[in-house]
Amino acid sequence: MASKEPAWLAFARQQIGVREIVGPKHSPVIMGWVQRLGIKVLGIKVVDDETAWCGTFVAMCMMIAGLASPAIAVRASSWATWGRELLGPRLGCVLVFTRTGGGHVGFYIGEDATHFHVLGGNQGNAVSITRIAKDRLAKGGMRWPAGVALPAVQVIRLNAAGVPVTVNEA
């Protein structure tokens, strides 16, 4: 019997295809998340969808599930100390990655031999599923919400065919 997806991941899947609008106009969906989360959750004032919004997306998914976010949720690196650290993946766990000039955060949906398959925001300027190299996972960068029952380790093997690889989510 397949395990039920966490509420935050179910919401995240519903958002696949939401895109930022490059230039002077901004996505009403993304800006709606920014407005709903506000400075108190995001930690800074966000005025456009040009600001890196992977952390905003994860925070919105957690809010929908009734869960708290880290102090400066807009920053991907803030998620590396949020909740509890995992030593093995679970469907929907938060993955925090390093990259030149910043970081990235998204949700585990599976993996192949060399990459995690990540559902996240601001991946190619959209909510999408992409592959990110396992060696980019930040120290302590596999996380689970505090106070939420922890399922068994769940390695989900996926085929890499047709899933793009990203090296810079900015």
Please report, for each region that a protein language model flagged, where it lies by residue.
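Intrinsically disordered, low-complexity, compositionally biased regions/tails
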Residues: 21, 27, 87, 110, ...
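...with weaker cross-activation on analogous glycine-rich loops/strands in unrelated enzymes
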Residues: 2-6, 47, 63, 67-128
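Helix N-terminus capping/helix-initiation residues
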Residues: 26-27, 75, 133
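Short glycine-rich loop/turn motifs that provide flexible caps or phosphate-binding loops at active sites
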Residues: 16, 22, 31, 102-105, ...
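N-terminal capping segments
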Residues: 1-67, 150-152, 156-170
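Active-site signature of cysteine proteases
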Residues: 114-154
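Solvent-exposed, non-transmembrane amphipathic alpha-helical segments
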Residues: 32, 78-82, 138
